[in-house]
Design a protein with these regions (language model features):
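Long, low-complexity N-terminal extensions
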Residues: 1-149
């Protein structure tokens, strides 16, 4: 993860280049840490969602499975309860959703599949937008969003 972070941070300082989100996902999937001998080995044995924005493709979401395979999605659920959550996302997601509506869909999906009551103590919420970049919601922002459900 540190390698992806430092790679993405370096690109703003290169005037004519920007890192594509799919390139970061590929780098993670290859297990690339700069050592070519280690490429294509099983990276970390974890599932990961990688979200980002680049000038070429806009907002993107990639899923990397424990083997390092990555796939691009519009909406994706991983972890406990992911089958039910993914079904709900496939039925309800639309590219015409506003950011607020997409956030509400994510939270209502979590509410449906989580065993314990959804609260600011057991969820995190983040978003990636072209104008504001990456933002992790504060507890106050999450409380406000949960109030809309």
């Amino acid at each position: 993860m540190h390698s992806l972070y430092t790679t993405s941070l370096a690109y703003p300082h290169v005037p004519t280049n920007s890192v594509a989100v799919c390139d970061l996902a590929l780098s993670f999937g290859e297990g690339s840490d700069g050592d070519r001998k280690k490429r294509m080995s099983r990276p970390f044995g974890v599932a990961l969602l990688l979200a980002g924005y680049d000038e070429l493709e806009g907002c993107q979401l990639f899923f990397s499975d424990p083997s390092g395979t990555f796939v691009r999605y519009k909406a994706k659920a991983i972890g406990a309860g992911s089958e039910g959550a993914q079904s709900n996302l496939e039925e309800s997601y639309s590219e015409s959703l506003t950011l607020s509506e997409a956030q509400d869909l994510a939270l209502s999906t979590l509410k449906q599949v989580m065993e314990e009551k959804i609260s600011t103590d057991n969820i995190e919420l983040a978003r990636v937008t072209p104008d504001k970049g990456f933002h992790i919601a504060t507890k106050e922002e999450i409380t406000e969003a949960l109030g809309r459900l």
